[in-house]
């Protein structure tokens, strides 16, 4: 499991950020505490322009990006749970429980936001739209989360990440935003790669 692997690696803390849901949070927290590891509960939310919109066309499809939020404390956990629940109750489209920026802003207290991976808003804008638009989005997240907004640097061996990281670091320098190193982990050992591919 994630927790036993973290213990083997002498990690003081470990985070769980499942896509769109928090089903594993209770078991994860219990296991982490049993192993004397600090659990960080998070969620990688699907963020749409309007979570309530249900009608789309080929020319105007449902556009959504991934957004990692981490709970700082119990209140943050409750806000994260509200966001995740609203995604299913109000924003479910197909298999995607969606939230939007207005809802995130409403429930932002005691949550940490990261710039995210290539499937997140700011990296997507850097690569596909322009740095000006990416900087505008960066400033929105910074204005909302202030000191609880962090740049996430990824290195999965994907060439596009180098450009994203360089641009994010320049934004960080300009606005005084701190950064963390993170990689998405979908399994704990490379021997599990084939099983993960089968699940996909």
Predicted regions and their residues:
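Phosphodiester-processing cores and adjacent nucleic acid-binding clamps
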Residues: 1-200
């Amino acid at each position: 499991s994630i927790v036993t692997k973290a213990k083997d690696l002498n990690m003081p803390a470990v985070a769980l950020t499942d896509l769109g849901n928090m089903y594993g949070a209770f078991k994860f927290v219990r296991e982490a505490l049993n192993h004397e590891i600090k659990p960080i509960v998070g969620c990688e939310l699907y963020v749409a322009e309007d979570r309530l919109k249900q009608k789309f066309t080929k020319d105007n499809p449902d556009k959504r990006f991934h957004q990692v939020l981490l709970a700082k404390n119990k209140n943050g956990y409750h806000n994260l749970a509200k966001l995740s629940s609203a995604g299913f109750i109000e924003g479910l489209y197909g298999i995607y429980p969606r939230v939007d920026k207005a809802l995130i802003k409403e429930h932002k207290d005691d949550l940490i936001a990261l710039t995210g991976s290539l499937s997140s808003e700011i990296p997507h804008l850097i690569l596909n739209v322009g740095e000006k638009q990416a900087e505008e989005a960066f400033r929105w997240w910074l204005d909302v989360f202030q000191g609880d907004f962090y740049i996430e640097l990824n290195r999965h061996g994907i060439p596009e990440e180098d450009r994203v990281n360089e641009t994010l670091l320049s934004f960080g320098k300009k606005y005084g935003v701190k950064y963390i190193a993170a990689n998405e982990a979908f399994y704990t050992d490379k021997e599990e790669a084939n099983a993960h591919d089968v699940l996909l």
